[in-house]
Amino acid sequence: LFTINFLSFMFSAFLVFLIKTNLSENILSTSENEKVKFKDGLNFVLSDKKIYYLTITKGMFGISAAGLLSLFTILSLEVYDTGDLGAGLMWSARGIGAFIGPVLFRYLFGKTDQKLLSTIGPSIMIWGIFYFLIPFSPTLYVTTILLVLGHCGGGAQWAFSSYGIQILTPDNIRGRIAGLDYSFYF
């Protein structure tokens, strides 16, 4: 499994090296880029409403999800009596949903930037609704389906909020904004 993972990363790196396009905006010189500080990133976030909301969405998601993941083990051991298999199925369901969600939302709601960004709110609600139903689930398999569906929303929220930050921030400050984005979550 490690070898497959390694080879996939090497292949990805090879594909990146094949890109011949300059992907930078080239607005600022190198010396001006070096002057961008953490405070500049924070000021940019606070001054732009869209960036502010995109930046805090993962943090709010993290606060609302705090502790839920440890409940998979409790559900598996105490409620469903399925041990490691149950916990593994629940964790796998999250991953499947997080993978399917952004692709499905993009297909269903459109490919334009505005349409993708407008799905962030509904995707959070979808995540919340399906997670709310988990305590009422009679079996591990129903819980697994609820987790897949819930994480379709959670995955879309995560992917599209990151995408929004990438397309709405200038090159010279994007790293600071991304750093703030993830610091609010972790």
PLM region spans:
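C-terminal transmembrane bundle of multi-pass solute transporters/carriers
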Residues: 39, 46, 60, 66, ...
